[in-house]
Amino acid sequence: MNPDIEQYRIAREPFYRPQGDEVVLHEAAYAARLPVMLKGPTGCGKSRFVEYMAWKLGRPLITVACNEDMTASDLVGRYLLDRDGTRWLDGPLTTAARIGAICYLDEIVEARQDTTVVIHPLTDHRRTLPLDKKGEVVAAHPDFQLVISYNPGYQSLMKDLKPSTKQRFAAFDFDYPEPALEAEIVARETGIDADTAARLVKLAQAARNLKGHGLSEGTSTRLVVYAAQLILRGIAPRAACRTAMVRPITDDADIRETLDHAIDAIFA
């Protein structure tokens, strides 16, 4: 076994509950070697979905958390200087292309546009990655796939993908699960009882209803899970909700008070 491949494999099945036909669609996209774009709010399950699909498809997964300081060299690689001279070190995108991994660029709109254009040759019929500094063109492994994600709610004129980038991908829309399904996910993920899980989800729904009315983003499923984990460790439900589900999403005193009242009503 190639240790470079094995270190990126998902050892155990990640828990993921499909919301629709996204699993079947991704399997078809992978079979066709199509790049995939996942769109949805923060903490709705995009990253967990990618982990699950990597496990289901039996492929290694290399994840890159994109940020505004990321350069093209951070993705493709660079020369390093050591006591033996200079040596080339592949970046995560190049490594994935060589070994046939799924490369997941998380929150790609956070990266500069002049950085993300390096993925273009990998996302059309060429499936190649030019390493200009090395004078090499890497032909992607037949099993390689590129997956990107971003939150459309954070789009702006300054942070958005170019149309020339968007039109290279098959796109899946994600959102927070329906309340019953979300409660099931929270209970399965944490071991919390079904009644408490349902109450936590009800609070999350109340926060999401404030999006656009003082909140830029509602409470994510991830934060609901955090609250459940605190409750399981002996924290009172109201305190757990304030700590994990309200305080992280707003500093506005009026909105905090509104959500604190919702907590008191739900956990009366």
Where would I find each of the regions flagged by the language model?
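AAA+ P-loop NTPase catalytic core and its hallmark functional loops
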Residues: 1-198, 202, 261-268
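C-terminal engagement/docking regions of AAA+ P-loop ATPases
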Residues: 54, 237-268
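Alpha-helix initiation and N-capping motif
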Residues: 69, 179, 234-238, 256
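Conserved AAA+ ATPase small/helical "lid" subdomain
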Residues: 183, 190-248
